[in-house]
């Protein structure tokens, strides 16, 4: 939850006195025009940037007191724009969602999870394709799969799980937007 979040850019209030509470199993969608501060709010809630005023808490702990490593276990973020500089395959990109957690061990469970997420996102057929050869919509689905695998790793714990998506349907065709 958050308490009285405020953010300013160049002395202009972008966000002012925002209180949000999200309970387990709830879905929250934030709508507004371009430039309204939706991405900034997501970045504050995820701990990527710090608000000028107010606080964000995960399970009663201030996000500013939570290590980056621990944040990786309690939330997964898919930002509005994500680029891949190197020549990775789709599978490599999704697998990085697991490695972001600092666990470099490989097992059949990881392989099954990756295949399951690729199938769920309907991109299994792209598994060995190079990311930079994909369409914008296909790239978006790969990043979504990567976000899901980040959450899957610890899904058997009682820790709160937060999937934060910024413009999740950007570049997707209508059928995938609906799914």
Provide a role label for each language-model segment.
Residues 2, 15-17:
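Conserved structural motif at the start of ABC-family nucleotide-binding domains
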Residues 31-33:
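The feature captures the beta-strand-to-loop junction immediately N-terminal to the Walker
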Residues 62-76, 104-107:
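ABC ATPase NBD coupling module
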Residues 156-158, 163-167:
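Catalytic Walker B motif of ABC-type/P-loop ATPase nucleotide-binding domains
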